[in-house]
A protein has these predicted regions:
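A short, aliphatic-rich beta-strand micro-motif
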Residues: 77-78, 85-93
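Conserved helix-loop-beta segment at the catalytic/binding core of cyclic-nucleotide signaling proteins
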Residues: 185, 192-224
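Short hydrophobic/glycine-rich mini-motifs in sensory/regulatory modules
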Residues: 92-103
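Short beta-strand-to-loop transition segments that serve as allosteric relay/switch motifs
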Residues: 101-111, 217-219
Length: 247
């Protein structure tokens, strides 16, 4: 498992961990949420519409039945088939901090057993190192690779993220959109600041070759991207939806 994940760039690992998990658990419906703080987690990758059903952001601390079990570092099994929860879930920890929540649907009742729970625990341990390392890499990327004095990612770092997201989108592991932003030489920093205020924590602003500015919107469908673009335009940020990057 770990070797199959190690073939990917660090910023791709979390996407393909969902694919590996789905294969090993024999389910088409798997989601991975990254824990943002002690209450909220954000959807990072999902293998189906069903796996996206809880939404892009969840208050996991209020999902009592599941949270209590995960906080005790055990696998949650949804024995009551409560539709508000996945059928099984497991949390990945690093130094006693919850980092990720793995969620599974699409498995028959007879497979929701202690044996499967143990298997999910083992898979969690196996992908933990690759995934925690990838998570740290992305955090470091965000901290260290900004263009000096701005919150705009420099081209090499931004291109790696964009390619990872677009490849994962093409494989159905995530939804995302890329907006090219119109800037002039003298207002780039101002537009960048305005843009960052309009974006969510999970989105990115960066430059590609030639100094062109882009916004990468995570967990955003084509329909949502159109609405985001319209909202940006109203705030004075002119942009277009870009289908791909040609670099």
């Amino acid at each position: 498992i770990t070797s199959s994940l190690e073939q990917y760039e660090p910023c791709e690992v979390l996407f393909y961990a969902a694919e590996v998990l789905a294969k090993l658990m024999g389910s088409k419906d798997v989601a991975i949420y990254t824990v943002a703080n002690r209450s909220y987690a954000r959807l990072f990758s999902a293998t189906s519409e069903k796996a996206r059903s809880l939404g892009n952001s969840i208050n996991y601390s209020e999902m009592d039945a599941m949270y209590t079990v995960l906080a005790g570092k055990k696998v949650y099994i949804n024995k009551n088939m409560d539709e508000r929860y996945p059928l099984m879930a497991n949390a990945i920890y690093s130094e006693d901090e919850m980092q990720l929540i793995l969620m599974i649907w699409g498995i028959p009742w007879e497979r929701m057993t202690l044996g499967q729970a143990n298997m999910l625990t083992v898979i969690g341990y196996l992908i933990q190192n690759a995934v925690v390392r990838a998570n740290r890499y992305i955090s470091a990327l965000e901290q260290q690779r900004y263009i000096k004095g701005t919150n705009i990612l420099e081209p090499e770092a931004f291109l790696a993220l964009v390619k990872a997201y677009l490849n994962a989108r093409d494989k159905g592991l995530t939804q995302c959109a890329l907006l090219s932003v119109d800037t002039k030489e003298n207002d780039r920093d101002e537009v960048g600041k305005r843009l960052i205020k309009l974006l969510r924590q999970s989105d990115y602003v960066g430059e590609l070759e030639g100094g062109k500015m882009y916004a990468l919107l995570a967990n955003t469908s084509a329909k949502d991207a159109t609405m985001v673009r319209e909202r940006f335009e109203k705030e004075g940020v002119s942009c277009q939806i870009q289908e791909d990057v040609f670099v």
